[in-house]
Amino acid sequence: GFASMALCCLLIDTMYKFEHGSNATNYNELKYEEMLMTYMNDVFSSLDVARAFYKGIRCGILHSGETQSGCMLSVTCNHIIEVKGNGLDTKINVNVIDFSNRVIQYINDYINRLYMDNIQTRKKFIKKMNYLCDRKSFIED
């Protein structure tokens, strides 16, 4: 579950950069939470839940190799995310399988926006791809 969730968190990080045409390697907690509430608002219906995910799941797993702040991973909970508490005391239990499927759905939705001639999405995609393709190789001829 931890490896799958780590990959989901990295995919969300990457998709943020494609959604915004961003070359930046760092962005802040608020932008991540905004991304979750904008593109997966069926799962992240409040800032409290998005913040708990960012701090307790994403940062916990990617920076410490564990969930934090009372947040947990599961394969048996009945919803993608079960929420307990509110505000700074919000704790979540994330169903790894369902969440992974939701991230895949989000990526497919993004691909569909590219196919559907969404000009802004395409411009930002091109900007990000140009940045990736223009990087100089570390290998000298």
Give, region by region, the residue ranges found by the protein language model.
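Short, contiguous, well-structured surface segments enriched in hydrophobic/aromatic residues
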Residues: 1-38
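Hydrophobic/aromatic-lined pockets within catalytic cores
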Residues: 16-23, 40-44, 62, 66, ...
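Anionic, Ser/Thr-rich low-complexity intrinsically disordered regions
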Residues: 15, 20-28, 46, 68-75, ...
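Histidine-centered, metal-coordinating catalytic motifs and their short helical/loop contexts
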Residues: 47-74
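A structural signal for well-ordered alpha-helical segments within the folded catalytic domains
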Residues: 6-9, 13, 30, 52, ...
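Short, solvent-exposed segments of well-ordered alpha helices
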Residues: 2-3, 45-48, 90, 94
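Amphipathic, Lys/Arg-enriched alpha-helical patches that create a basic surface
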Residues: 74-141
